[in-house]
Regions:
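Bacterial Sec-dependent N-terminal signal peptides
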Residues: 1-23
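C-terminal PAP-associated
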Residues: 21-369
Length: 369
């Protein structure tokens, strides 16, 4: 059971605690012209060949080293007992089966509910596979389909993300490509999840491992694991119209001790929009005993917040800022060291699980109350 906690008044604090650290985009990409694509269902009852989905192409890279060994203090957020749930259990509205086993491990499921539909996506042998469900009944709307059948963007490789853009009543699907360092994005042309999509393919300088995506009024944003953590801004306004769209890339300093590391984009949810002109946000945690040994705070670790003011008309006016370090209770990132992907034991199996110590879990959600 995981401890639940709340970061209170997070974005109110950001307004009052901006810093002077600014970063311009280190790469501005040429406009990408979309193609129009349509859903092509796969044949029901045909299963993929068993395989392990190896998306660790960039996860086993050398860690950013420091000269002082990591230090350890009491982990105050380590929950060692089961607490009774303090809130009543809500009545279940709907329960239905999603996509079946594709014989791919891990499945990396992703899903999102919109006004009328729910879309689920998982890894398949030929890249990501998704299926659309009626949100009122749970009934499938057509057969499952592979992302790569949506058009001529080439073969997909997985790590799907499904996003519902409530501000525009549109759907956005993404996965990385099997051909080079590319990300494939599909934006629905209408609110119909089973209608036509615009397909965009953006090339990144490195393989975009562990991609995570967010929606914000000023753009679509995604992060990935490419060494020094990058974040990308996509021209949402152009993509919603099916027009040629550009991408900008920014990076933040890597943290010593980790090899695999990535920011998590903050996704807008709810009905009250962020304040006009509010920047997009990105977050990560910092265990300063692990990343700053010998020069650390023994009472707290931190959540770091970055803000991005993106300007697609004048890219040199775009700025990424480190705006806030939120003190939180001490926690310990040393789980079988700082780089092992095989650590957590499980009953009845000799296979150990990846502790995923390096990243904040997706999604990090923004609500404006």
């Amino acid at each position: 059971m995981r401890t639940k906690f709340t970061l209170s008044a997070l974005f109110l604090l950001i307004v009052c605690n901006t810093s002077a650290q600014f970063t311009l985009p280190d790469m501005v990409f040429e406009p990408v012209t979309p193609i129009t694509v349509y859903l092509t269902p796969i044949v029901e009852g045909v299963y993929d060949e068993p395989r392990e989905f190896n998306n660790f192409l960039k996860r086993d890279q050398p860690a950013y080293v420091h000269t002082t060994p990591p230090m350890h203090y009491k982990d105050n957020v380590w929950q060692q007992s089961i607490n009774a749930e303090k809130t009543p259990v809500l009545n279940q509205l709907l329960n239905f089966n999603g996509i079946g086993n594709t014989n791919v491990s891990p499945p990396d499921p992703s899903g999102e509910a919109g006004q009328d539909y729910y879309i689920q996506a998982v890894n398949g042998a030929s890249g990501a596979r998704f299926r659309i469900f009626d949100k009122a009944t749970g009934n499938p709307v057509g057969a499952a389909a592979n992302f790569s059948t949506l058009g001529t963007l080439g073969s997909g490789y997985g790590d799907p993300i499904v996003i519902y853009d409530a501000m525009a009543d549109r759907w956005v699907l993404s996965e990385f490509s099997a051909n080079g360092n590319k990300m494939n994005f599909y934006v629905s042309q209408t609110s119909a999840a089973n209608g036509a999509y615009w397909g965009y393919q953006f090339t990144t300088p490195n393989f975009p491992d562990y991609p995570k995506m967010s929606v914000w009024p000023t753009g679509y944003f995604f992060t990935s694991n490419e060494g020094a953590p990058p974040l990308y801004a996509l021209d949402r306004e152009k993509m919603l119209l099916g027009q040629p769209a550009t991408m900008q890339r920014f990076t933040v300093p890597a943290m010593a001790g980790f090899g695999f590391q990535a920011l998590t984009p903050v996704d807008f949810d709810g009905t009250n929009l962020p304040p006009a002109g509010a920047p997009a946000y990105f977050a990560r945690h910092r265990d300063d005993e692990a990343h700053n040994p010998g020069n650390n705070n023994t009472a707290n670790d931190f959540i770091e917040i970055y803000s991005l003011n993106v300007n697609f008309t004048t890219p040199t006016a775009s700025t990424l800022s480190a705006v806030l370090k939120i003190p939180v209770s001490e926690f310990d990132s040393d789980l079988c060291g700082l780089t092992s992907f095989s650590c957590i034991t499980q009953q009845g199996s000799n296979t150990k699980l990846d502790p995923l110590r390096e990243v904040l879990m997706y999604k990090v959600q923004y609500r404006n109350f």
